């Protein structure tokens, strides 16, 4: 098979003819396996069995680590010696026993039979084993049988193994009853019979008692040393027990432990008293400790970076810097997380100024004034500071590494380098540090190499490569030619200083003779003529300019000021990117300024994606580079006027040109990468902002209830079905989240009494359900525009049947009810929930669409809980265009911060979290916690009774089971609330507020002042009813409004004066919480806009479906004056009489047929009604709109190149002389390969598109979806055609398969192969992921099971319709792979067909075994 068959868009050629080329592409299986060379000889295995036992055990216990190897080896040798001694004793015992038996047998012939029988039985067993090893069929069955574990012979010397033992590590302490312990001991005694060395009973020796007594007196009874043997055996048993102790890592794969967060590192995170998110983020920088000076430097560094993006008044800059420094101190020194700082240290983020009233003096304390407050930092800024802190630590770590290298060079070689000493302390970016590091390795290459060799750290290939690349410049530096470099009259650093315009200008001095003449006198063995000397010196000086940190800084600054981005289509892009392609927007885009890129970061990321796909080349260039070059020349030239000066200046300019060429390439790469990172960060933050807006909505508010009340919901949906044909699934969900009822309705149509039309059969049941359950709202959603019809139907039913919600008391204290509201619900979470494992676990008996309805209802009840429940799947939701182009971890990190912000704004009822999994999903986002600490908290609460009575009970000080440490408690306390029970004397009302326990005394003082209690009253109340008595009294007397009378300014001043605490904003929070504890601060539930509903139900956005675009429509009805059709997205299309055709001489029905798919141009789109007007006229269809090009500004779009490409493509089309072919088949689309792939991208696996072929009128192309991102293009040859436009009566695929029509081909070829692909991907041996990850799995498996061979299948993404069969014949063998081809009848491996997966696996084993046997011969 040729290479171009595997390129997307090309149909398959004759498979029979090209099979060998595919084999060559993969490599010949047998030749590749020869390097593995693993022969399976049973005799060799038997000989090595003892030697390998210990290695096997070591691998299984931990994949053999290098730590403490010597100690382990010594222990292993001791165990081996004891094992050998024990085996020798047992052999001696057996030998003696046989002699005794022979002796006894002579005296007692009747006993000989038993011994003989036993001996015969042993021989039979050995013979059976030998016979098995010689049977090849058995070897084939056992080969690669990794799922069937070898069954070891029973070992009665080991502990009894219970089925549940692998779960031991999940159990804290199992306490067994005395009976169980006794049974265990009895089992052990039976399992390990004690072998004693001594004389047998009298009836087996033939000696009388007296003779025995004499013998014992002379020789002893054989038990004199039993105590020593018993001690040794006990010691050995203890060692065996230690060795047999299983950790989780012995039972589970490392990836499984990491997924379940059960690794040792996870346990450390749980136990360390530090916020979990801080621990994870700071993990790479644990060893970086900042000095006080560095900490101050960091604060200034972060403030300066943030000021670039802030628009602050000059007088606010200094307060801003102080605020940043204080927040940094809270984050780093105090280990407070962002939500805590934002909630409880607000005063440090606000700058307040006292403004005197009526022009009084600000210094006059008696004058009146107002407070002018300026907010300096918001929540996003705090997260930015957290990120900047990590970046600064990375910066310091790299700087320390460079400083250490320089210190070593300076101390060993007595070198002082002013460039390093000047530039290193002031470097503020990673690029600048890298410049200094490159300079060091260039300037002191030999010294660093000597140091490296001295320290024994060769750094592998990287070090050797660096040594080779520096070799030429070291030769120049050590030769006479370097004298010519010095004669340039100025150093590279001085030249860069002039270019930077920093400090005093450095002047260039000319040498006393011309460069050529000087070069003649500098010839040596390295450079043996003047031209070589000149070339070497010029290259050396240019390299010194390139390596100058200051010069790189000059170029980098100029690049960012003068950078521009150009896009150039590749040959592949010329064909693939047509005017309907999403990349056409920048196919001919030129001269985009970096400021333009900053305004549309998503566009640049798409450019890079297109470049990655080989369709576009993105070039970042330096505008007016020639002018910049000319401006640099005066900084290196001398001011002298002479022929001598001219010759030197000419050489200097040549060196500068040489250096600038290399500098441009070096800086270009870093600039392009930096722009990409900035664009990714920008898009990720846009996603975070969009997610924050979706999170910032309270539950749907029932009529008459306060904001935050959870509604009762009835949710309905038809999914993708059509009303009247498909059932309507529904679910009723209570406010506590329980699904009390669910079912299906088939007919909810409203009747018409006047016309004698009865109501639908299920309408009465719906009305009865609503009247019985009294939901607060009806939620509707779906996956097609049919949902709009369901919404209208339900709205009409509510009006016609006067369906109302629950009763509530209005402002006049009367009980009323309102008509139910029907709401179209955002279903992005419900779509992910309906087929999730969580849904199956919650309601295993529900249908997927019922799960979907449950998801809709729960979204209405709490959007926050539903989003939090998604975990890492949150990235599946589309928040912003270009989101998929952002690194997933970066996106997850940004989205997590949005969840953290909102969860801590809302708070979590800790007792509800213990009993409700949906609420428990919020705990990982609580300040100070994370998934590990949250799980630990729930575990401890359940262990200690399952109820939390106060916030202080969570503090793990002096308790048996600490839920959290002091730091974590300080972070999380105010965000975990406990419902206040007025009947409970120990319940503290402040535990149900946002007030932090550190401020409880302030809150109680404010409550006492509001109640006008004096000190004696306060003491009496608290002595009698505890510290919370004052606030309870405030609540009990409904006197919360009195706190509004308090003058908080005085409180704040006293706190700052006496305790040095700034609490003005905190006092406002306390006042609000005393009036309404944990008030709902989120916005009202957000209803979807028209555009949002349109996108949700059709999947189309303003970018993918707009007026002027050409789209395929399926014709549903043909009339004389109009045609009705439907777009693929479900939008109804109407073709007016004037837009049906350009050929008025032919009847419309002769041109078009029902269910035919034709291209149409959208003339008008109504997103509210899901309808559009389209044109089928060739004149309109051939001129689609070009919104991308139309949006481009003059001078930024290469119209000339676009026109040239269009003319070239038209000429090619005319040469082909073909018209667009249309076939009457529901799967036909007038697509090219790219459009077919895009169309099938969102479809299911196995879906098909029939399309025209580029090979001519006697060919068709069939594209089908093999898997996500993998599509196969099949070339279909048509034979026996009636005419050029009809479909052939015989269809041939690959010269092997023949079909009678398209339906036969689709069903028996494509669908048959799709079934085989499903069978492969559902097989237990199939591995998700790439070939490399499958190789890694095989490596891991064979390390854990050294004596086993393993194989697995994985998909081949480059060759559609092929899979890899990857296998590894033992721990030390190489990993190999063979291609497996999917065919309609099954699979092909090594040109052998197999009907199913079982036959394929067996065939592979047989092929491999035969190949190995052939090698042995």
UniProtKB/Swiss-Prot annotation:
Regions of compositional bias (Basic and acidic residues) in chain numbering: 1188-1215
GO biological process, one term: G1/S transition of mitotic cell cycle
Keyword annotations: Chromosome, Nucleus, SH2 domain, Transcription
Principal location listed in the UniProt entry: nucleus
Gene expressing this chain: spt6
Family listed: Belongs to the SPT6 family.
GO CC annotations, alphabetized: euchromatin; pericentric heterochromatin; transcription elongation factor complex
Region entry Disordered, spans: 1-109, 122-185, 1181-1215
Organism: Emericella nidulans (strain FGSC A4 / ATCC 38163 / CBS 112.46 / NRRL 194 / M139) (Aspergillus nidulans)
Protein name, as recorded: Transcription elongation factor spt6
GO molecular function, one term: DNA binding
Compartment annotation: Nucleus; Chromosome
InterPro entries per UniProt: HHH_9, NA-bd_OB-fold, RNaseH-like_sf, RuvA_2-like, SH2_dom_sf, Spt6-like_S1, Spt6_acidic_N_dom, Spt6_death-like
UniProt biased composition (Polar residues): 135-144
Segments of skewed composition (Acidic residues): 11-28, 43-54, 64-73, 166-179
One Pfam family of this chain: SPT6_acidic
Family matches, as PANTHER family: TRANSCRIPTION ELONGATION FACTOR SPT6 (PTHR10145:SF6)
Domain S1 motif: 1108-1177
SH2 domain: residues covered: 1226-1326
Record's function text: Histone H3-H4 chaperone that plays a role in maintenance of chromatin structure during RNA polymerase II transcription elongation thereby repressing transcription initiation from cryptic promoters. Mediates the reassembly of nucleosomes onto the promoters of at least a selected set of genes during repression; the nucleosome reassembly is essential for transcriptional repression. Essential for viability.
């Amino acid at each position: 098979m040729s290479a171009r068959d595997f390129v997307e868009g090309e149909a398959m050629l004759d498979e029979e003819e090209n099979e060998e080329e595919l084999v060559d592409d993969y490599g010949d299986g047998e030749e590749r396996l020869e390097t593995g060379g693993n022969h399976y000889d049973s005799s060799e295995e038997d000989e090595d069995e003892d030697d390998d036992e210990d290695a096997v055990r070591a691998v299984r216990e931990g994949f053999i680590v290098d730590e403490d190897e010597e100690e382990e080896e010594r222990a292993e040798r001791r165990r081996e010696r004891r094992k050998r001694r024990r085996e020798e004793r047992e052999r001696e015992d057996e030998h003696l026993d046989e002699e005794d038996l022979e002796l006894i047998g002579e005296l007692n012939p009747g006993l000989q039979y038993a011994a003989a029988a036993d001996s015969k039985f042993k021989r039979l067993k050995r013979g059976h084993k030998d016979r098995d090893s010689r049977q090849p069929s058995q070897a084939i069955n056992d080969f690669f049988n990794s799922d069937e574990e070898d069954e070891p012979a029973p070992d009665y010397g080991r502990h009894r193994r219970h089925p549940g033992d692998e779960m031991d590590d999940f159990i804290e302490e199992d306490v067994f009853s005395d009976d169980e312990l006794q049974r265990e001991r009895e089992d052990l005694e039976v399992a390990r019979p004690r072998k004693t060395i001594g004389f047998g009973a009298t009836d087996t020796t033939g000696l009388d008692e007296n003779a025995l007594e004499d013998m014992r007196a002379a020789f002893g009874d054989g038990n004199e040393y039993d105590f020593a043997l018993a001690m040794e055996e006990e010691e050995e048993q203890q060692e065996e027990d230690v060795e047999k102790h299983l950790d989780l890592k012995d039972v589970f794969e490392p990836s499984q432990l990491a997924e379940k967060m059960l690794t040792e590192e996870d346990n450390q995170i749980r136990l360390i008293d530090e916020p979990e998110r801080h621990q994870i983020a700071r993990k790479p920088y644990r060893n970086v400790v900042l000095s006080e000076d560095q900490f101050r430097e960091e604060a200034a560094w972060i403030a300066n970076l943030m000021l670039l993006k802030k628009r602050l008044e000059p007088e606010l800059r200094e307060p801003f810097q102080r605020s940043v420094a204080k927040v940094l101190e809270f984050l780093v020194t105090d280990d407070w997380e962002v939500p805590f700082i934002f909630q409880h240290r607000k005063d440090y983020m606000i700058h307040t100024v006292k403004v005197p009233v009526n022009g009084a003096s600000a210094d006059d304390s008696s004058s009146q004034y107002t407070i002018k407050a300026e907010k300096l930092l918001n929540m996003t800024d705090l997260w930015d500071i957290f990120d900047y802190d990590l970046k600064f630590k990375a910066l310091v770590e790299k700087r320390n590494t460079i400083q250490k290298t320089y210190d070593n060079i300076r101390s060993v070689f007595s070198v002082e380098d002013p460039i390093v000493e000047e530039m290193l302390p002031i470097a503020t970016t990673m690029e600048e540090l890298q410049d200094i590091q490159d300079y060091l390795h260039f300037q002191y290459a030999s010294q660093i190499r000597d140091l490296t060799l001295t320290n024994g750290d060769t750094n592998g290939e990287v070090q050797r490569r660096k040594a080779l690349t520096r070799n030429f410049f070291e030769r120049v530096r050590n030769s006479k030619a370097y004298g010519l470099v010095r004669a340039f009259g100025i150093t590279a650093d001085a030249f860069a200083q002039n270019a930077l315009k920093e400090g005093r200008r450095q002047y260039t001095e000319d040498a006393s003779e011309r460069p050529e003449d000087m070069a003649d006198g500098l010839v040596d063995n390295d450079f043996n003529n003047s031209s070589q000397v000149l070339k070497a010196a010029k290259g050396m000086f240019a390299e010194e300019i390139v390596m100058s940190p200051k010069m790189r800084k000059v170029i980098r600054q100029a690049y960012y000021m003068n950078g521009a981005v150009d896009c150039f289509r590749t040959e592949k892009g010329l064909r693939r990117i047509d005017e309907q392609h999403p990349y056409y927007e920048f196919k001919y885009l030129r001269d985009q300024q970096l400021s333009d890129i900053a305004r549309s970061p998503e566009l640049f990321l798409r450019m890079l994606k297109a470049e990655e796909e080989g369709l576009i080349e993105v070039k970042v260039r330096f505008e007016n580079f020639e002018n910049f070059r000319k401006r640099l020349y005066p900084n290196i030239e001398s001011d002298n006027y002479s022929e001598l000066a001219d010759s030197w200046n000419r050489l200097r300019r040549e060196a500068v040109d040489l250096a600038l060429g290399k500098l441009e390439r070096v800086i270009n790469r870093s600039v392009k990468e930096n722009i990409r990172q900035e664009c990714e960060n920008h898009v990720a933050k846009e996603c975070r902002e969009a997610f924050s807006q979706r999170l910032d909505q309270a539950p749907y508010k029932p009529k008459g209830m306060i904001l935050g009340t959870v509604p009762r919901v009835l949710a309905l949906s038809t999914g993708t079905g059509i009303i009247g044909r498909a059932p309507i699934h529904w679910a009723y969900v209570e406010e506590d989240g329980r699904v009390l009822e669910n079912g299906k309705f088939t007919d909810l149509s409203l009747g018409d009494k006047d016309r004698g039309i009865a109501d639908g059969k299920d309408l009465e049941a719906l009305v009865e359900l609503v009247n019985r359950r009294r939901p607060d709202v009806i939620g509707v959603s779906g996956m097609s525009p049919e949902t709009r019809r369901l919404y209208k139907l339900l709205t009409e039913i509510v009006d016609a049947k006067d369906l109302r919600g629950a009763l509530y008391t209005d402002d006049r204290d009367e009980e009323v009810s309102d008509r139910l509201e029907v709401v179209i619900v955002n279903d992005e979470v419900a779509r992910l929930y309906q087929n999730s494992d969580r849904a199956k676990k919650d309601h295993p008996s529900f249908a997927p669409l019922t799960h979907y309805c449950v998801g809709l209802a729960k979204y209405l009840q709490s959007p926050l809980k539903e989003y939090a429940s998604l975990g890492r799947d949150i990235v599946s939701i589309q928040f912003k265009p270009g989101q998929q182009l952002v690194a997933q971890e970066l996106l997850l990190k940004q989205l997590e911060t949005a969840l953290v912000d909102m969860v801590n704004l809302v708070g979590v009822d800790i007792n509800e979290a213990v009993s409700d999994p949906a609420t428990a999903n919020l705990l990982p986002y609580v300040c100070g916690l994370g998934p590990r600490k949250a799980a630990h908290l729930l575990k401890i609460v359940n262990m200690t009774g399952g109820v939390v009575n106060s916030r202080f009970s969570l503090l793990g000080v002096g308790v048996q089971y600490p839920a959290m440490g002091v730091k974590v408690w300080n972070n999380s306390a105010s965000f975990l609330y406990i419902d206040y029970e007025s009947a409970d004397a120990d319940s503290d009302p402040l535990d149900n507020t946002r007030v932090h326990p550190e401020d409880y005394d302030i809150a109680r003082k404010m409550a006492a002042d509001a109640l006008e209690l004096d000190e004696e009253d306060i003491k009496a109340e608290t002595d009698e009813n505890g510290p919370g008595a004052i606030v309870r009294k405030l609540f009990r007397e409904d006197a919360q409004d009195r706190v509004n009378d308090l003058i908080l300014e005085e409180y704040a001043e006293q706190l700052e004066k006496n305790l040095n605490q700034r609490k003005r904003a905190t006092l406002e929070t306390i006042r609000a919480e005393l009036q309404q504890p944990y008030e709902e601060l989120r916005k009202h539930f957000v209803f979807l806009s028209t555009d949002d509903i349109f996108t949700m139900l059709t999947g189309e956005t303003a970018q993918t479906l707009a007026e002027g675009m050409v789209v395929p429509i399926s014709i549903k009805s043909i009339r004389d004056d109009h045609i009705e059709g439907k777009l693929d997205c479900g939008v109804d299309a109407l073709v007016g009489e004037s837009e049906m055709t350009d050929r008025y001489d032919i009847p419309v029905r002769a041109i078009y047929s029902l269910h035919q798919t034709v291209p149409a141009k959208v003339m008008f789109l109504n997103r509210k009604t899901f309808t559009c007007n389209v044109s089928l006229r060739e004149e309109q269809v051939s001129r689609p709109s070009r919104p991308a090009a139309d949006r481009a500004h003059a001078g930024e779009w290469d119209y000339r190149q676009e026109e040239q490409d269009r003319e070239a493509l038209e000429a090619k089309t005319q040469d082909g002389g073909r018209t667009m072919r249309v076939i009457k088949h529901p799967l036909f689309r007038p697509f090219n390969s790219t459009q077919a792939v895009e169309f099938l991208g969102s479809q299911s696996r196995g879906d098909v598109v029939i399309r025209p072929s580029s090979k001519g009128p006697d060919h068709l192309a069939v594209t089908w979806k093999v898997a996500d991102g993998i599509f196969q293009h099949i070339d279909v040859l048509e034979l026996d055609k009636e005419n050029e436009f009809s479909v052939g009566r015989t269809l041939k695929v690959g010269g092997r398969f023949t079909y009678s029509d398209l339906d036969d081909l689709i069903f028996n070829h494509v669908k048959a192969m799709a079934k085989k692909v499903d069978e492969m991907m559902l097989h237990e041996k199939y591995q998700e992921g790439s070939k490399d990850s499958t190789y890694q799995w095989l490596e891991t498996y064979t390390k854990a099971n050294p004596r086993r061979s393993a194989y697995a299948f994985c998909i081949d993404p480059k060759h559609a319709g092929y899979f890899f069969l990857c296998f590894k014949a033992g721990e030390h063998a190489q990993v190999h792979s063979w291609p497996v081809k999917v065919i309609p009848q099954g699979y092909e491996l090594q040109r052998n067909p197999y009907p199913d997966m079982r036959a394929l696996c067996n065939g592979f084993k047989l092929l491999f075994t035969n190949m190995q046997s052939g090698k042995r011969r």
